[in-house]
């Protein structure tokens, strides 16, 4: 099993990254704030406008350390990936499948099955653990709707129909998402998914976490030799990691959504960690971003048993394992792609 290394998060807006020997060094002006050996890193995520030196970016690319640049508010800017890895035949197969609507639907259908399955089990867990604190009939109704969609999704062989099912499932799930917020309800409320920009604190936290998860999925896909920009359900768009968005669909609910709910319900995130702009946008403050990133790293270290492989692993390795299973399917080593089904 692959070893999970560290992700270095740079949260200071005026930090500049440079290379010294085999270390990434963080500067603020002329002051050296810290340094970390490249050998312990697998990702660098920077929220600074100042960027990094070409020497550091080259060293990271050479060592397959993925570097991601975001704005301080978490909007994606650019990624440094280095040379493409893996067998060119695998990527050619990926492109052929992507160009074939029926074959694309076969893969995407399993991914969306995983998404709906996992959304349903987030609701079922809440009913099991906190039945007296939620509107149980509403959650039960939404769970039943998701179950109905699961039963019908296997017969779908059209991408537009699949997107329709996915949209209805998301509406049912997010329609009761506010019920999953158990504490700080006077501060955190959810009236529906919104982004670009997020308009409330819950959506601000979700958007930031989805950005981190998308980066992890893109890095995982590239590490096994797949092209993160060529998807099966999310179609080609310049600059969009479409396959990473496909892969993260089944991981949103069990990993990202539950993570954000935990931060709110345990008061790791509070009202003071958010700022409101005059245009209505809501963003994490510097302290809020640091709290979320620290908790995200800890969550990724937590162990689970992979439902398909029946092996224990850290949450942070799940995107890599799913990317590996997808590559095996495309090579013809598996009859179908097995989505991540969490309970």
What function would you assign to each model-found segment?
Residues 40, 48-121:
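A surface-exposed, charged beta-strand/loop segment in the N-terminal or early-internal portion
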Residues 1-20, 29, 35, 89-343:
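Active-site helix-to-loop segments that bind/position phosphate- or nucleotide-bearing substrates
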Residues 1-72, 82:
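Terminal-proximal segments
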